[in-house]
Regions:
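Small-residue-rich segments of transmembrane alpha-helices in multi-pass membrane proteins
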Residues: 4-10, 61-62, 124-140, 254-267
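Membrane-embedded alpha-helical segments that form the functional core of polytopic membrane enzymes
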Residues: 7-47, 57, 81, 97-108, ...
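Cytosolic, membrane-interface loops and tails of multi-pass inner-membrane proteins
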Residues: 47-68, 166-194
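Multi-pass membrane catalytic core of lipid/isoprenoid biosynthesis enzymes
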Residues: 56-97, 189-214
Length: 277
């Protein structure tokens, strides 16, 4: 997940800078997002240390296995955060602000406040996924894309998160239930959860089509073709899951949906560079 967040931020910077992309700035954008995401992951693991030991998929993490103490993990996470904020502030104060908002949303809103209390944890915690796109955008001194496009792309990440995480949660439903984490598939039946996932996918695909009908986003035929093809694939695999809900099919949907954002952002970068050429 960290790699994907770094990629969306880097792609956002390239798309915003166009042919004036600075390699050094691109490295700083990528590094600051990696450090910030790693910081959020580390502090999140610190908060989750008592439940990570319960779940098979998380008990191999450094804190549950004793490779690092909780106190040292917390200190390490804060050092990573400080480095991330320093680098992103060098890029732009707004980049640093976006980084801080993303960190706080993931660690405080998602991990600390909501993860153990509400199925909406990944929705309200999903705003953290928006921020790397803004970090990359605000690092551009003279963006060729409007801010509305950066916000649009950031919220495409937001709308992608429910299908991605809830498909995973169906596969590991029993582990979440054992850890008393109220993920959607824990509090709803498998078939009902699949229906909700399908609805969120339809919303995401419909949202991705908005620039097809609004030239103000400054995205053109490469983006249009990319989201139409990928949207069709996403709808098809969700229809397949709806036809026969199962943990195995949900796991397949999770794996197929994972590269969706990668290809969308590749399409965005290609679209912008070709249009400016």
């Amino acid at each position: 997940m960290i790699s994907l967040l770094v990629f969306t931020g880097a792609a956002s910077y390239i798309a915003s800078a166009g042919w004036h992309t600075n390699v050094f700035t691109l490295i700083l954008v990528s590094g600051s997002i990696w450090l910030g995401s790693a910081a959020a992951n580390t502090i999140g693991s610190y908060f989750d240390r008592d439940i990570d030991v319960i779940m098979d998929r998380t008990r191999g993490r450094p804190i549950p296995t004793g490779r690092i103490s909780p106190a040292n993990a917390r200190a390490y996470g804060l050092v990573l955060l400080a480095l991330s904020l320093a680098i992103s502030y060098y890029l732009s104060p707004l980049s640093s602000l976006a980084m801080l908002v993303g960190f706080l949303d993931y660690t405080v809103v998602y991990s600390y406040l909501l993860k153990r209390k509400s199925w909406s944890n990944i929705i309200l915690g999903g705003f953290s996924g928006v921020m790397p796109v803004l970090v990359g955008y605000f690092a551009t001194t003279d963006p060729v894309l409007p801010l509305a496009t950066a916000l649009f792309l950031g919220f495409l990440v937001f709308f992608w998160i429910p299908e991605h995480i809830w498909s995973l949660a169906i596969r590991f439903r029993q582990q979440y239930e054992d850890a008393k984490i109220p993920m959607l598939p824990v509090i709803m039946s498998e078939s009902r959860s699949v229906q909700v996932i399908a609805v969120t996918t339809i919303i995401m695909v419909a949202y991705s089509f908005i620039p097809l009908f609004d030239s103000g986003f400054n995205l053109h035929f490469v983006y249009d073709g990319t989201v139409v093809v990928l949207g069709g694939i996403m709808l098809a695999i969700n229809a397949w899951l709806l036809h026969q809900p199962s943990a195995e099919r949900a796991w397949t949907v999770f794996k197929i949906s994972s590269p969706y954002l990668f290809f969308v952002f590749i399409g965005v970068v290609a679209d912008v560079l070709l249009h400016l050429h």
